[in-house]
Amino acid sequence: MNLTELKNTPVSELITLGENMGLENLARMRKQDIIFAILKQHAKSGEDIFGDGVLEILQDGFGFLRSADSSYLAGPDDIYVSPSQIRRFNLRTGDTISGKIRPPKEGERYFALLKVNEVNFDKPENARNKILFENLTPLHANSRLRMERGNGSTEDLTARVLDLASPIGRGQRGLIVAPPKAGKTMLLQNIAQSIAYNHPDCVLMVLLIDERPEEVTEMQRLVKGEVVASTFDEPASRHVQVAEMVIEKAKRLVEHKKDVIILLDSITRLARAYNTVVPASGKVLTGGVDANALHRPKRFFGAARNVEEGGSLTIIATALIDTGSKMDEVIYEEFKGTGNMELHLSRKIAEKRVFPAIDYNRSGTRKEELLTTQEELQKMWILRKIIHPMGEIDAMEFLINKLAMTKTNDDFFEMMKRS
């Protein structure tokens, strides 16, 4: 029996399964407690139980395997990992571990890990001699992540504008600068769907911080990938813990030469959470930001890199501006020069209900010549020269109308050449 499979089973089926095993009063219990009771009953019959999760090591030296389904929140069905196992396999926070588990003995509260079968989807022996993330060599992004799907749909228009305005590569550190109601969540969903469609080999993680619960549900249903969220009714410490778990997991996967993509909504809210959590240093910047508060969100954002030894970590984060809060302006100013790709959304364009509301002239990618062919780069530059004198709304309307006539960007450039 597998713990993860039970977590994905609907509650009604779990109750039926439990009643068939002779358990009572399940209807009044929480889902995690029902799973706990079923597994305890199952283990009494002497059969094996398997479980997996992402390791979080606590200060006392032991750790727990947390589940991504509950957004790495501590719960009764977490799996205890002993300090000796952590030392033996050289495990770190963020390692994805699967193995055989046993039910709690008398006086214990958690399931315990008996045997490690896999570390980060690899044999445990291979995990011992990997290079630490901090020691890997960072490079410019040089392998393109294409967003265009080529199916001619209206969603694909957004992806195509994105490919023209600011191409994204593996290892990009991108910032989407957005005022409220400019369609940033829709844009992120679009990017997520394009990545799942065009690059199924990449590990996609969507991290929603301080978000509305209904948007979390929508994202989980639309995105083929891991959606980890902490809603606005949870404390700041919880936002911070979720973000730390996601970035640590991503780093461990990059050490195993995987390409990981994190879509973060939003870095402003994450920085606000760190500002609440961090101990007061006595120095306060404009807008009430503590002088030490922005170091950790910068470490999160700065982890994005293309790695020479193989693998990459791409982070596309949204930053909020024009919210009327001085703190948000300060946070944006701090992150402004750190990314190597910027996409600006415009409130004016969105108010006219023209989507995607991208401010084409202000958006762009550094070192874009590494991501595109020389011929494509020339065409993109010519397009910029045509669009530059127009106003931001006219530019976007012109581009969308022209793109709608063709199915792919190559066709669009051909049409441009002829005219």
Curated annotation (Swiss-Prot):
Q: GO CC annotations? A: cytosol; membrane
According to UniProt, where does the site described as RNA-binding 2 lie? 326
Q: Name one GO biological process term.
A: DNA-templated transcription termination
Please tell me whether the keyword Transcription regulation is annotated for this protein.
yes
Q: Name one Pfam family in it.
A: Rho_N
Residues of the region (RNA-binding 1) are: 61-66, 78-80, 108-110
User: Which PANTHER family would you find in this protein's record?
Assistant: TRANSCRIPTION TERMINATION FACTOR RHO
Family, according to the entry, reads as follows: Belongs to the Rho family.
Q: What is known of its domains?
A: Each subunit has two RNA-binding sites, one at the surface of the hexameric ring, and one at the center of the open ring structure, where RNA helicase activity is thought to take place.
Q: Provide the function of this protein.
A: Facilitates transcription termination by a mechanism that involves Rho binding to the nascent RNA, activation of Rho's RNA-dependent ATPase activity, and release of the mRNA from the DNA template. RNA-dependent NTPase which utilizes all four ribonucleoside triphosphates as substrates.
Tell me what this protein is called.
Transcription termination factor Rho
**What organism, scientifically named, is this protein from?**
Escherichia coli (strain K12)
Lineage, please? Bacteria, Pseudomonadati, Pseudomonadota, Gammaproteobacteria, Enterobacterales
